[in-house]
Amino acid sequence: MPKVLAIVLAGGKGERLFPLTSFRSKPSVPFGARYRIVDFVLSNLVNSQIYSIYLLVQYKSQSLIEHIRQNWFFSSVGSDHFVTVVPPQMRMGPEWFQGTADAVFQNIGLIKEHNPDIVLIFGADHIYRMDIRQMIKFHIENNAHVTVAARPVALKHASSFGVIITDPDHRIAGFQEKPKDPIPMPDNPDMAYVSMGNYIFNADILIDALVRAEKKKQHDFGAHVIPDLVGRKCKVYAYDFAKNEIPGIKSYEERGYWRDVGTISAYFDAHMDMLGEKPIFEIYNKMWPIHPARYEGPPVKILDGEIKNSIIAEGALIYGGKIENSFIRSGSIIEKDVEIKDSLIMDDVIIKRNSKLYRVIVDKKNVVYEGEKIGFSAEQDRFRCYIDSSGICILPRAARYNDWIKEINHA
């Protein structure tokens, strides 16, 4: 295997995920009962035996930096085994990162110092499993300069992505970045072939492309670098993500599952995809684990109640009530006679007795008051919650911090 360096772009604002991104970047938003969004790309890299990883951060990065420090460190097994967070250094000038390509250009010295054969440029804000070694194999076998991970999406959604036009041998002949009128796939007029935002570059090609882009003040891979490489007849190929084989995948799972959780509704739906006896994305896969945050507290304790089709993390304390189609993260306390349905309860939340929640996201360090009902009346909810366009109610992080502190001290 060639010498590989991975650069993970983890600086996204995640504005469409507001208010979950009020105090954190999109990659550090909690996901599932034990994870953060960034854990999926990092798990894919480590499971693929890729251990040299730089994580480029920018906006509201402290939460992400702490998560990496506490959960993603390697023992002293060699200088090429690291997950290193890289904030903007501003060595090239006073500006922060101006785009995805500019973020890598500003750290071009790290690439030269590491001296890899190939460089992976991956995003940090998608939910999926991928054996990246198979994409590397495809890249090498095709003698490619650049390989772009790609997948089909419905034509009506393709305007949100970079749309790819390929030759029969998978070489990219055209690239449209977020076009108003995307070109459909030749064999399926209802679908378009789109970039997943994950790239493999030969190191020399990447360095040259970044320097060219900087001279033109072009700062984005999808909008500038990839189209320029295609236009200059470089060997740019598309890797079909649907052909990626993951060990341990069940027959009932969706083939090539990949979700952009950039909106509240998409984020919520991706959670629901993990529930049920036969979920389309099975989080329980010992052969390709998603590595969670370490938790040093006690196990979950359930004293009473009725729990259906839900995932409960360590450290949760459940006194009773009904929980259905929901996620409860670490340290949360659910009192008696509570009803929670189709909801996401994040870390260290207190749900007081006789309260009812339906399609609600309660961010961390919050309290839901005794007898309170959220998710049943938009007219009432708008005074106490953020209501997404999808109708999902969100109680922002620490929105009731003073009351939460009183409950903690009282307990």
UniProtKB/Swiss-Prot annotation:
Enzyme Commission number(s): 2.7.7.27
PROSITE patterns: ADP_GLC_PYROPHOSPH_2, ADP_GLC_PYROPHOSPH_3
Catalytic activity: alpha-D-glucose 1-phosphate + ATP + H(+) = ADP-alpha-D-glucose + diphosphate
GO molecular function (one): ATP binding
Function: Involved in the biosynthesis of ADP-glucose, a building block required for the elongation reactions to produce glycogen. Catalyzes the reaction between ATP and alpha-D-glucose 1-phosphate (G1P) to produce pyrophosphate and ADP-Glc.
Family under the similarity heading: Belongs to the bacterial/plant glucose-1-phosphate adenylyltransferase family.
Protein name: Glucose-1-phosphate adenylyltransferase
